Amino acid sequence: LDDKELLYPCYCSRKTVAGKPYSGTCLNRLAIKNTQHSIRVKTQAGSISFTDLIQGKFEQNLKNDVGDFIVKRADGLYAYHLAVAVDDAEQGVTHIVRGSDLLESTPRQIYLQQQLSLITPLYSHLPVATTHLSEKISKQCKALDVLSQEKPENILIHSLAHLGQQPDASLKKANNKEILQWAVSNWNLSQVPKTSEIIAPSQYYSSG
């Protein structure tokens, strides 16, 4: 990326650029010696588009919607988008299945893949489980470990149903391993709902 003159130092704080496309404040700014900074990659005019195997066609104009984005953080760590683009290519990953909360960031990874002459894998973005307030279920909303539930099998069956997989009635008497084996054998990607989120029952993410 540096050989292509696509990188430049950025001294902006997160607070000053949060919630809006980066305007290029530091694009033509002279480097400041001995000052902590992140590294941004220049984006280009035009749209990045791909067809998600679940959500369908997705298109984004990086320059207008995102702006130049960070590929190396001020603390010296490489940013997620660059790390996964390179790591997936190194491992020969051909298919990526993940939550729909990462759908909008995918064009940034594809852009880096293109600039680095890496193969772009196929993407499938599943709807994420959320609370009734559209908060992603996680430790932050007191989500409970599946295996800590009184009947974890019910959660697995419930999840399969919400993902459009139509679990067999016989699974009500199955154990966790048997349910997962059924899911692997009968998984049908075309039946997964084309939506970004699915509201989960409150007992699955709150202890009280």
Feature annotation, model-predicted:
Residues D2-D3, A161:
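Alpha-helix boundary recognition
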Residues V146-E150, I155-G208:
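Polyanion-binding catalytic cores of nucleic-acid enzymes and NTP/SAM-utilizing transferases
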Residues D3, P9-S148, P167, K194, ...:
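Active-site cores that bind ATP or allylic diphosphates and position pyrophosphate for catalysis
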